[in-house]
């Protein structure tokens, strides 16, 4: 009989590995994928089965905020620019115009790469909520920063309608409740 004691230093949470590959399509992060509303690309019934995040060649993890999808292009564009930035605002990865907008999350630590590297899984920070690692703290607390002020970064409009005037905008306060009803004289959210 054989046994080995495992400490918390040898345990990591993992997620399915989705490598960024030029010419591939990735899905937008949406929390409403279900049997009735599968993801457009992989037909996943759960968010965690959709390809909405990627691991780049430098072991940085990003979430896809936009993939250039439209009503006539529901699957989105192919991704041409590998995300490599580490600033906290969602950004384009390059100048190809592929329509992708990525949000940087974290970098897999070198020690985790050595201990846990796999072709099937990515390690994620074990203590995301309490970590004092400056990089994780910065990402975690970005939503509470005075710069970001918990902004909505992307709005998905299921049925855009027609007859709206371009260039009109209306500022509205969105309060965190179970739902929000907006009535705008310009009928447009920017």
Q: Can you say where each PLM-predicted feature lies in the sequence?
A:
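Feature for peripheral, non-core segments
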Residues: 1-61, 65-182
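Single conserved hydrophobic/aromatic residue that forms the stacking wall/gate
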Residues: 181, 186-190
């Amino acid at each position: 009989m054989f046994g080995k004691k495992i400490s918390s230093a040898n345990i990591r949470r993992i997620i399915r590995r989705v490598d960024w590959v030029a010419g591939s399509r990735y899905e937008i992060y949406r929390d409403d994928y279900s049997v009735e509303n599968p993801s457009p690309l992989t037909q996943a019934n759960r968010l965690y089965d959709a390809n909405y995040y990627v691991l780049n060649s430098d072991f940085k993890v990003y979430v896809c905020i936009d993939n250039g999808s439209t009503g006539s292009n529901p699957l989105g564009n192919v991704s041409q620019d590998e995300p490599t930035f580490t600033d906290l605002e969602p950004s384009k990865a390059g100048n190809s115009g592929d329509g992708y907008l990525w949000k940087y999350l974290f970098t897999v630590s070198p020690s985790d790469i050595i201990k846990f590297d796999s072709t099937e899984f990515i390690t994620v920070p074990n203590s995301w909520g309490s970590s004092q690692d400056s990089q994780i703290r910065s990402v975690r607390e970005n939503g509470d920063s005075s710069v970001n002020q918990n902004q909505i970064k992307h709005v998905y409009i299921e049925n855009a309608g027609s007859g709206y005037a371009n260039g009109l905008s209306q500022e509205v306060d969105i309060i965190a409740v179970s739902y929000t009803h907006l009535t705008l004289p310009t009928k447009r959210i920017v």
